[in-house]
Amino acid sequence: MGDMKTPDFDDLLAAFDIPDPTSLDAKEAIQTPSEENESPLKPPGICMDESVSLSHSGSAPDVPAVSVIVKNTSRQESFEAEKDHITPSLLHNGFRGSDLPPDPHNCGKFDSTFMNGDSARSFPGKLEPPKSEPLPTFNQFSPISSPEPEDPIKDNGFGIKPKHSDSYFPPPLGCGAVGGPVLEALAKFPVPELHMFDHFCKKEPKPEPLPLGSQQEHEQSGQNTVEPHKDPDATRFFGEALEFNSHPSNSIGESKGLARELGTCSSVPPRQRLKPAHSKLSSCVAALVALQAKRVASVTKEDQPGHTKDLSGPTKESSKGSPKMPKSPKSPRSPLEATRKSIKPSDSPRSICSDSSSKGSPSVAASSPPAIPKVRIKTIKTSSGEIKRTVTRILPDPDDPSKSPVGSPLGSAIAEAPSEMPGDEVPVEEHFPEAGTNSGSPQGARKGDESMTKASDSSSPSCSSGPRVPKGAAPGSQTGKKQQSTALQASTLAPANLLPKAVHLANLNLVPHSVAASVTAKSSVQRRSQPQLTQMSVPLVHQVKKAAPLIVEVFNKVLHSSNPVPLYAPNLSPPADSRIHVPASGYCCLECGDAFALEKSLSQHYGRRSVHIEVLCTLCSKTLLFFNKCSLLRHARDHKSKGLVMQCSQLLVKPISADQMFVSAPVNSTAPAAPAPSSSPKHGLTSGSASPPPPALPLYPDPVRLIRYSIKCLECHKQMRDYMVLAAHFQRTTEETEGLTCQVCQMLLPNQCSFCAHQRIHAHKSPYCCPECGVLCRSAYFQTHVKENCLHYARKVGYRCIHCGVVHLTLALLKSHIQERHCQVFHKCAFCPMAFKTASSTADHSATQHPTQPHRPSQLIYKCSCEMVFNKKRHIQQHFYQNVSKTQVGVFKCPECPLLFVQKPELMQHVKSTHGVPRNVDELSSLQSSADTSSSRPGSRVPTEPPATSVAARSSSLPSGRWGRPEAHRRVEARPRLRNTGWTCQECQEWVPDRESYVSHMKKSHGRTLKRYPCRQCEQSFHTPNSLRKHIRNNHDTVKKFYTCGYCTEDSPSFPRPSLLESHISLMHGIRNPDLSQTSKVKPPGGHSPQVNHLKRPVSGVGDAPGTSNGATVSSTKRHKSLFQCAKCSFATDSGLEFQSHIPQHQVDSSTAQCLLCGLCYTSASSLSRHLFIVHKVRDQEEEEEEEAAAAEMAVEVAEPEEGSGEEVPMETRENGLEECAGEPLSADPEARRLLGPAPEDDGGHNDHSQPQASQDQDSHTLSPQV
């Protein structure tokens, strides 16, 4: 019989998942001969090669692999010629075994207890200790993975590289390793199929050296493997002797021996530590390419009856073979299968391994999972030194469809498949590791690949030295494997420098073309050759990221989810009388396959609202809003048709409410597939309608004699159809905006014709053509039409954010917006390229990753949303301003409120509906007359607009505010309108429309830097409007108002604000809501009010002016029309008797004290006295009587009678405000005085000349009651 390639030890490690042998009992694997047909355990003969291959399960738990049949040339002659060369034994994986004596019957000297299956733990004492010299490395083999998704860990990698083989029937003294060149007989004979039992005692005399690190690790691993256990080489030959006499009675010994052999691999490190990472992919991919390119007919077991053993079950629990294949009675069964079944649960995916050709498996478990397709690889080394492989897939039986797996786990095998032959490297398609390993890819595999993903997630015991690779970890994400990941990425991944956060739509050719072509070729080959196998699905979206965020998963779910409803098929046969022409296939949606009979229906299909998807398209440089995935894919298809690759970032996917799903908005059939967000004053995003918006016409019809309509453009001399077309001609927007910005007022004009008409406004030249509607106006009315009717100065320059489309009025606002919303600040480590969001995270990173480095502060770096990174803030600011001219857009600001509009018709509609327009021509004439007559104050620096006057002056002349609004609104709006009247530079007499332009003009033209709020009347400027108002009030407001109290009889203090006057009246006079309409007075500049300087108690005398009440001068402001006014009900009268008869009705109780001067009531006499003294300046009666007596005595002694006063000189003090009536003395009776009441003002006119000088205690002219 022929011989078979010896499997490399680390290749065998990659195929199986072996638990820690210290936790296993060897007796657990024992099966009696009577149970071998019912139990899934199969007690085959002991094969140490297969036992050793169990040791690498922990190295790649997620790497599915397939054990293969290696066809090699017969080596019987060479091995028979070399069987006398016995050297110190080496394990065929490069590990040193014990140096046994060259006794040809050495294997017969083993302990009989071990031969009978007892525990072999006592056997190492009989062997020589292992040697510690450096070992040659055998790393030529790599696992070959099958392109099927449900291949968890399988036996693989036999025969990828040519190595020396031994004869299947070794001589009795076959304890030593036999060497010899391999190339002598590689191509001599067509080799029949062999199985794993042909692999014995092989040594490669010329191994390829490993790198130093890997060699040392290899050597250390080999020593650690052999030292604590018995010599595996001797055990292997002992197993060989048992194999020739394989009987059912040896099953106990086999199981025990195998369990003992498991201890040999407990400390074997994973394959990743033994092999360089850069050689892991090429061999596997070469096998896949050969498998796809050359489909060689499978050689069945019946064609080669002598060689039907091909590892019938060391891997997939002996369940991958076909139950219909006959069992070979001579086939010894693998001990790995029995051990695998004894230590692995049947439902553990990692215990499922597939043999390469298990059609002739001796037994099949009834509950075994579906079979994995097998691969047969023929390896031939040519004379030139190249290695050629022929890969043939052995398909499962067609009568068992459950054995056809779905998907492909190629990525796991490719990511772990090493190869050291540079000639065998094949470029690896990027989508394989993305789909198979799920290395940070958000999409993973589709629903068909769920079984593979679940199998990778399952956990099982592993070797103690084999670290697990977590699911979803990117290559190189584990600590300690940086070199491997770097080599893997450098040698295998496609050179696609994709943005981090960028999502690429692969189904629209958004991955590199070579990758997409490879995927297409592979899919087509599999469809032609293997229709029964489910093809690997290419993911639609690639997320180049270490970990997929939740929003990306939702985004992928939206894009990848299948249609919940069947495809819509319309009725393409309309009635004949409908005269509807329908295409043969209707109007079909290229994204989902739905077809429609009408084009409008297709447009409504693209405009349906199902989900809120907001992405930033890097090609369009703006944020797009989609409400269904068809519109998103259609937008990507538009880019694909131009040869571009759509990349989108800043994902925002969220559901929409049911009330927002159905919006009654007409959908234009020519609207783009990606409707922008709805237009708003703040964002300024257009709806993207294909038809131009209608022109904005004037707010109201102009007076006929003031304007003249023309249908010819005076700028380009183009004849128009009507005035609407002329207005649209002046308002059309051109794509080229260079040279359309006015240098005087910085206004951005829509086109050249409008720009020329606008320039003549500043030059004051005719013809006076409106830049908005194109009409001709007379010079006197031109500014009125331009400002009030067409709102030309509502045009402003806005700056649109290229990232989100938000429009700002200034560059400073745009810069702050970008820095806050679209700029990310990171703290970069000073020793490595890692960057973190916070400084504390960077410090923790430095402490853990760079503990020996001196402490250095982290560096701030700035990342723009376009993925550019800057290490200085000024660089990113320069990056913001590099394309400022491209961000300028024209917006329209309402002159009455701060709202912004993108379209001029929207502004006009807003003004009409919110602020109103003139109702008739009379108002227009009044507007015109006010414009002609109003002018600014001389000597002030108030900027005026030429040739018409300010809007505020014209609006103030209107009878009811701006075109029909109430007077109250007119007063409120008068002040804001003053700020919008424009500015005139006093140095160059240039007029600018707004404050910002005035500040910019002063800085550019005259080199003066003004603050944000300059004063119109002087050269000062301020930062806040409050400071400006205070400055104007204190320095420029020469005409001031003061407010006096009309209820105070004497000279009362003035109040600068009405609120202070209201407080005074409420507190002093008890009136809550006084009428202040007649209380204000204008204070002359630099002067004082006469009442302010009056004495508080003026002395009555001859100099008193006639015609005043009680001989005192009473101002009309102080005294209203009525002398007596009731404080309770505002009753007023000039008659004192009438007033005294009125106030008792407000007296609730007779015991209540009531003021006879104002009618207010008090609970006690003391309160009334205090009120009389404070408000009416009337003292108590006793004090008044004493003062009157003292004054009378003084008058008798000193005073002389005046002008015929007679002999009797009564002392008329008028302290109570009651004048003498017809020369009668004042009655002393209080009741009589109360009933008498105050005399009219006319009665006091005759006795003014006889009134003596008042005493110093007289306080008021009002009537004082007797208490």
Curated annotation (Swiss-Prot):
Cross-link (Glycyl lysine isopeptide (Lys-Gly) (interchain with G-Cter in SUMO2)): 202, 206, 546
Tissue: Widely expressed, with highest levels in skeletal muscle. Expressed throughout the central nervous system, including in the cerebellum and cerebellar vermis, with higher expression in the substantia nigra. Widely expressed in fetal tissues.
Record-linked Pfam families: zf-C2H2_11, zf-C2H2_ZNF592
Compositionally biased spans, kind Acidic residues: 1199-1210
Domain of life: Eukaryota
Stored SUPFAM superfamilies: beta-beta-alpha zinc fingers (SSF57667)
Comp. bias (Basic and acidic residues): 300-310
Positions annotated as zinc finger (C2H2-type): 587-612, 615-639, 711-731, 740-764, 768-790, 799-822, 827-850, 892-915, 983-1006, 1013-1036, 1043-1069, 1124-1146, 1153-1176
PROSITE patterns linked to this entry: ZINC_FINGER_C2H2_1, ZINC_FINGER_C2H2_2
Keywords linked to the UniProt accession: DNA-binding, Isopeptide bond, Metal-binding, Nucleus, Phosphoprotein, Repeat, Transcription, Transcription regulation, Ubl conjugation, Zinc, Zinc-finger
Modified residues (Phosphoserine): 78, 142, 145-146, 529, 573, 689, 691, 1089, 1205, 1250
Assigned GO CC terms: nucleus
Primary location: nucleus
Biased composition (Polar residues): 476-488, 1250-1267
InterPro entries: Zn532-like (IPR045914), Znf-C2H2_11 (IPR041697), Znf_C2H2_sf (IPR036236), Znf_C2H2_type (IPR013087)
Biased composition (Low complexity): 345-369, 456-465, 925-936
Keyword DNA-binding set for record: yes
GO biological process, one term: negative regulation of insulin receptor signaling pathway
Location of the protein in the cell: Nucleus
Region (Disordered): 1-62, 124-153, 205-280, 295-488, 673-696, 918-970, 1195-1267
Molecular functions per Gene Ontology: DNA binding; DNA-binding transcription factor activity; insulin receptor substrate binding; PH domain binding; zinc ion binding
Family to which this protein belongs: Belongs to the krueppel C2H2-type zinc-finger protein family.
Role this protein plays: May be involved in transcriptional regulation.
Subunit structure as annotated in this protein's UniProt entry: Interacts with ZMYND8.
Name of this protein: Zinc finger protein 592
Organism: Homo sapiens
Gene this protein is translated from: ZNF592
